[in-house]
Amino acid sequence: MLCLGWIFLWLVAGERIKGFNISGCSTKKLLWTYSTRSEEEFVLFCDLPEPQKSHFCHRNRLSPKQVPEHLPFMGSNDLSDVQWYQQPSNGDPLEDIRKSYPHIIQDKCTLHFLTPGVNNSGSYICRPKMIKSPYDVACCVKMILEVKPQTNASCEYSASHKQDLLLGSTGSISCPSLSCQSDAQSPAVTWYKNGKLLSVERSNRIVVDEVYDYHQGTYVCDYTQSDTVSSWTVRAVVQVRTIVGDTKLKPDILDPVEDTLEVELGKPLTISCKARFGFERVFNPVIKWYIKDSDLEWEVSVPEAKSIKSTLKDEIIERNIILEKVTQRDLRRKFVCFVQNSIGNTTQSVQLKEKRGVVLLYILLGTIGTLVAVLAASALLYRHWIEIVLLYRTYQSKDQTLGDKKDFDAFVSYAKWSSFPSEATSSLSEEHLALSLFPDVLENKYGYSLCLLERDVAPGGVYAEDIVSIIKRSRRGIFILSPNYVNGPSIFELQAAVNLALDDQTLKLILIKFCYFQEPESLPHLVKKALRVLPTVTWRGLKSVPPNSRFWAKMRYHMPVKNSQGFTWNQLRITSRIFQWKGLSRTETTGRSSQPKEW
């Protein structure tokens, strides 16, 4: 329903426009005589008759001595809401100005004609947009505008439609259409400034004793001409600006200031030239870019200059030169900014150089990156050093056991009896580690030959000299440390091995910390020192049982390098030697104790 209501109102409004009777409108004739040598504008005011104006604007009448504050419609909110039409010469319905004439602009109740031409001639009607009462139907103004070019060429010094006033001095504003007539011949003139009536001024010139900023604006001068048949109003529009005196200085370049500019090779670059030009009435600024290479110099085609700031006294103009990519060749050139006005010219050259900070930054970042990489690699190397060494041994190292005249890769020593409660379960005791896990991993998996007294020596025990002999014939000594071990007779084996290692550089000792223990005061000084300096591998219970655990990797790291492919033959050879040594031992032990001697 709302849409239907709007459509109905639009149709009614359209019928009113089509059937709009302009016979009741007040009529005013205007003449616009324009010069073909200059650009000028023209304005029409919607000047309603006084009775209708007071009804439409709801304003109080002024006494004859009072001067209206504003030109009709310019100061009234109601009068700003008017509609302009043009009446075609062929009698067609009225045309909306806003839709059909782009060179005509409506500003409140004023029509601005931007370009002169005889095609602007015609009848223009203005009326209120909102018709609130039957009286408003006849509230309209019809203006008959005649436009023709100026034909009087006898006036050589006619006033311009654009006039300047010098600030701080005296000046005058002349009506262009009457500038060639003397004051005695000139008719009475009505002046308007920015839509306000200047009631005091009636001559063809406005004399200004001292020019200020507020004298700038749009002035309109009207006077009446008549003949025996009719009379009309001649109107001219003057654009007045207040200016300062022409500059006496050359333009100065604000940017670039320095004669060198650091750049990055391979990157795009924009060099800006900003220049400040002093005011000139005839303002023709010049700003260009040149390139100087050795003895050659040429102008560069760059984008158009643009004004970035304009004041009463000066204007700042900018023009840029754009390089898609900075090359080594550009570093050998000079880029010259050239600016000029009517007084003189100024130049500023710029030499490009490679940015040192970027190079240093790259070096610094590269150094830091290298340092971080080295630290990370060092940490990784430290963490996996054992695995790396073992991998290297597998493929590169030669067998260290060849030709050393030793029968065992390692002699294993552990506590054979227990006087302290074990911290481990029976399945993970020292004996289980020595007699079960060591053979399974070191012998069966990696091919090392071990000497285990409980396994490889015939029952009945061995003497101290026999243990020393076995250690001498071993490349490594493995000692499983525990409270039972350091407080029991097995510590003799460690002491003997330490003494032998001092003389035999091929004998290496490996300590296994099976569980926590305290060193007894009775330990020999040499053993105490050995506990601190010898390599120690910590047993971590069930975590160390798998053959691929770090415990076994550390054990292999300390074991001699051995070619595992030939371990079967070596084991057979070593086993036969052990049995030969056992038989010899039985025949030579008559009358000797089976217990190790006191140390």
From Swiss-Prot:
Detected in adrenal gland, bone marrow, brain, fetal brain, fetal liver, heart, kidney, lung, liver, peripheral blood leukocytes, placenta, prostate, salivary gland, skeletal muscle, spinal cord, testis, thymus, thyroid, trachea and uterus. Strongly expressed in peripheral blood leukocytes and spleen and, to a lesser extent, in colon. Specifically coexpressed with IL18R1 in T-helper 1 (Th1)cells. Keywords: Cell membrane, Disulfide bond, Glycoprotein, Hydrolase, Immunoglobulin domain, Inflammatory response, Membrane, NAD, Receptor, Repeat, Signal, Transmembrane, Transmembrane helix. SUPFAM superfamilies: Immunoglobulin (SSF48726), Toll/Interleukin receptor TIR domain (SSF52200). It catalyses: NAD(+) + H2O = ADP-D-ribose + nicotinamide + H(+). The active site is at 493. N-glycosylated. InterPro entries: Ig-like_dom (IPR007110), Ig-like_dom_sf (IPR036179), Ig-like_fold (IPR013783), Ig_sub (IPR003599), IL-1_rcpt_fam (IPR015621), IL-1RAcP-like_ig (IPR041416), TIR_dom (IPR000157), Toll_tir_struct_dom_sf (IPR035897). Its EC number is 3.2.2.6. Residues 378-599 are cytoplasmic. It is a single-pass type I membrane protein. Changing residue 210 to A: Decreases binding to the preformed binary complex of IL18 and IL18R1. Impairs IL18 receptor signaling via NF-kappa-B. Forms a ternary complex with IL18 and IL18R1. Within this complex, IL18R1 is involved in ligand-binding and IL18RAP in signaling leading to NF-kappa-B and JNK activation. This is Interleukin-18 receptor accessory protein. The gene is IL18RAP.
